[in-house]
A protein has these predicted regions:
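Glycoside hydrolase catalytic-domain context in secreted enzymes
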Residues: 1-389
Length: 389
């Protein structure tokens, strides 16, 4: 929809929030929406009147963190003008498996470049210039994904479907996939210091948990969330599950449904409790509070009411901090006319077009590298000078 309509919708939501107990503002989130071409995939939507930029792997092709940083600065202004205060990204998976359908949104496969781009992206999104701690009216929380690295799917199969549930490490490079998180997103150069949220992926990181020997979805793994993310790497922000991991699984392996991998025998409430005790704060895509209330009751019986209340209040604190970051308690409302001037403005569109140009990679159809009996790597028509796939 148009920026004006988005701004009006945001204002109406915030008005409604004011009437509820405690009057806590709404923190709206969005998947990437500035791609030059809408992917058409179920996990991503384009923006109709927003500036257009390269996809994640296009930023990698620029070999220039400043381009990613400029995008993040411009996109954060557009997001705020639309009422969005959390970006479900950047997607900082090292894409060592090029057959994965989400390759396009990653920042490439090279760890050092990915780290530089991650820092530039998160700093640009989260930082409001002139604010001592970086947080302010132009800030958008970043939710880096997918812990502990989603570019590891077996044979490139995608974990939105049960046939892609396993992440594998045939060369033993698990730690390499952590580096964009542990050496970049959690140690930013800018004043906000750290990405404010993390999203674990659906996958079962097969054989990684040597402590408990459990092969379960990442959010259900005590080792990956409690011991590594919260413990060893001391991440203090929000942990939000990927979308739809708590419901019962689909009947067929091809079904696009719940991804409760490894904990299918539990009830939904038991799954919620397991994730909460690991250190998860938020359940992506869940709109029913019933299973979480039931999880709390089970937890009170198992751990005691005092312990469960303290645990729930800790998550509440983390969630509230990200709302305070963006100044929503001070003023959550937008001026629709001002939003229309910001979103897709000439300056941002020019920056996006320049980035698209810089991301283009020219390949030579070399005869030296061609298969036997072929005049080039690609079997193109004779006399063709330029080929655009």
């Amino acid at each position: 929809e148009s920026p004006e309509i988005s701004a009006k919708w945001s204002n109406e939501l915030q008005k409604r929030a004011e009437t509820l107990p405690y009057g806590i503002p709404i923190n709206l989130s969005s998947d990437p929406r500035n791609g030059a071409k809408d992917s058409g995939a179920e996990f991503k939507s384009g923006g109709s009147e927003i500036s257009k930029w390269p996809e994640g792997v296009g930023f990698a092709a620029c070999f220039d963190p400043e381009v990613a940083g400029q995008f993040a600065k411009d996109a954060s202004r557009e997001y705020r003008a639309l009422g969005i205060t959390t970006a479900l990204g950047p997607q900082i998976d090292l894409c060592t498996e090029p057959r994965w359908m989400r390759f396009v949104d990653t920042l490439g496969e090279e760890v050092e470049m990915s780290k530089k781009l991650t820092k530039a992206y998160c700093d640009g999104m989260q930082t409001t210039e002139g604010e001592a701690d970086g947080w302010g009216k132009d800030s958008v929380n970043t939710m880096v994904k997918h812990w502990p690295g989603g570019g590891t799917g077996e044979a490139g199969r995608d974990a939105h479907y049960a046939f892609g549930q396993f992440a594998v490490y045939p060369t033993g490079n698990f730690e390499e996939h952590l580096k964009p998180f542990t050496e970049a997103a959690f140690h930013l150069d800018g004043p906000t210091d750290c990405a404010s949220a993390v999203m674990p992926y659906y996958t079962v990181s097969y054989g990684v948990d040597k402590k408990n020997g459990k092969n379960v979805g990442n959010s259900y793994s005590e080792y990956l969330i409690k011991d590594l993310l919260r413990g060893k790497y001391e991440f203090k922000g929000i942990v939000c599950t990927d979308w739809g991991i708590t419901q019962d699984p689909e009947k067929t392996i091809e079904g696009f449904g719940s991804r409760c991998y490894g904990v299918q025998d539990m009830t939904e409430a038991e799954r919620c409790l397991l994730a909460i005790t690991n250190g998860v704060d938020q359940f992506g895509g869940n709109s029913e509070s019933g299973p979480i209330v039931e999880a709390y009751k089970i937890g009170c019986e198992k751990y005691g009411e005092k312990a469960m209340r303290e645990r729930m209040e800790l998550s509440a604190k983390r969630l509230l901090i990200n709302i305070f970051h963006c100044g929503l308690f001070e003023d959550p409302y937008l001026d629709p006319e001002e939003s229309a001037k910001i979103v897709g403005c000439e300056e941002f569109c020019r920056h996006g077009y320049e980035a698209q140009q810089k991301s283009i990679v020219l390949l030579k159809n070399s005869a030296k590298r061609a298969p036997e009996g072929q005049k080039g790597v690609l079997p193109l028509k004779k006399g063709l000078k330029v080929y655009i796939p």
